[in-house]
Amino acid sequence: MENKSNSQILFAEAQQYIPGGVNSPVRAFKSVGQEFPRFIKFAKGAYLYDVDWNKYIDYIGSWGPMILGHCDDDVLEAIQCQVKNGLSYGAPCKQEVDLAKKIIELMPNIEQVRFVNSGTEATMSAIRLARAYTCRNKIIKFEGCYHGHADEFLVAAGSGALSLGQPNSPGVPEDVVKDTLVASFNDMESIQALFEKYKDEIACIIVEPIAGNMNMIFPQDDFLAKLRAICDQNSSLLIFDEVMTGFRVALGGAQSIYNVKPDLTTLGKVIGGGMPVGAFGGRKEIMQKVSPAGPVYQAGTLSGNPIAMTAGIKTLEKISQPGLFDELGAKAQKLVDGLNEAAKAYDFNFHAKCLGGMFGLFFCSDKIAVNTFVDLGKTNLKMFNQFFAYMLDNGVYLAPSAYEAGFISIAHSDEDIEKTICLAKKFFQEN
């Protein structure tokens, strides 16, 4: 009889009580062909430890928030001090003001900000606000860009087709997504066609300025600036979903790198230091439409709770220190350069790229441009799954999906990066 690991046992038990055994689908490891996920016991610095005491170099970082590494001493101390004063008040607290001021200081395109509990809440609220502000209903999103699981976002276009949205999850009525239009990332022609057809009906464009849910795809040929221009020409709002990229690719987010000013920005992940949080913010004249200042309703029992606010304040204080982002970027660049050199040495079809503390792995030649969701079909997903399994078995924890970006933290050491490169080199050599 096969001896089962504690993770296998826990997964079997979890499936009796939790649909699919997990509380977010990608965690089940099904997309990478694994029979069971690893159940984590604790984490510290750059490492995860599972319930079988296996140690992993973690390149997920809780899907982005752990930019300082797990259990940063200063963040933990701040949280522990706040815990003694209460977990949640259901009333305003000073920490909300302090975190709002810090975000606005670091992202000057945001003049006012509202805190929520997740990235999904942030994008959902931003869309509602944009519709109310413009008195229009239709929105444009991009194929392959993920903005949470609100009904209006669970839409995909046909292959290369421009069409009215069709829901791609059961339970989402067609009437809910009939006003969601889908375009192709990095393709201005698809955007122009939608504006020609629905010119006075489009409330906003929502976009990941760097598409981190298509692995990691950068905007090409001034794509973001062109989105800004077409929104201005048609009195539509531009929303940057920086839940993933905010305070991760740069201190001022992707908008500071590309020098494009959105009307609204959504945030999450890093601003909570590992605690559940989200936020949306932007121009004051727009944000003043949010209740109780204006008529657009948004509320939440745990919004702005003092624990998440405290963790966020300390995290942003630390990542604001001079030189930290230079060091973070150097770590990611060392990893990416090492992986690319290893692949080149063995003529292996692979390339990686990075920006700030975020990176993407593509299992195809660097001569193949991957600039759209359709382009991802050119990559070898089966080979990624094999790579994932090999790295996991050897103590490296990567995102369990070829469509997800990876994250590095300030806690990753040169030794961690070198071990990762050495393992990848061996895989490239053997495959």
UniProtKB/Swiss-Prot annotation:
Q: What is its main location?
A: cytoplasm
The molecular function terms in GO held by this entry are: glutamate-1-semialdehyde 2,1-aminomutase activity; pyridoxal phosphate binding; transaminase activity
E.C. number, please? 5.4.3.8
Q: Which reaction does it catalyse?
A: (S)-4-amino-5-oxopentanoate = 5-aminolevulinate
Q: How does it assemble?
A: Homodimer.
**What family name appears in the similarity comment?**
Belongs to the class-III pyridoxal-phosphate-dependent aminotransferase family. HemL subfamily.
Q: Name one GO cellular component term.
A: cytoplasm
Q: What protein name is recorded for this chain? A: Glutamate-1-semialdehyde 2,1-aminomutase
On whether Isomerase is a keyword of this UniProt record, the answer is yes
Q: Tell me which UniProt keywords the record has, alphabetically.
A: Cytoplasm, Isomerase, Porphyrin biosynthesis, Pyridoxal phosphate
Q: List the disulfide bonds.
A: none
List the NCBIfam families. Answer: hemL, PRK00062.1
At which residues is N6-(pyridoxal phosphate)lysine found? 269
What are the subcellular locations of this protein?
Answer: Cytoplasm
Q: Which pathway does it take part in?
A: Porphyrin-containing compound metabolism; protoporphyrin-IX biosynthesis; 5-aminolevulinate from L-glutamyl-tRNA(Glu): step 2/2
Instruction: State the Gene Ontology BP annotations.
Output: protoporphyrinogen IX biosynthetic process
Q: Which cofactor does it need?
A: pyridoxal 5'-phosphate
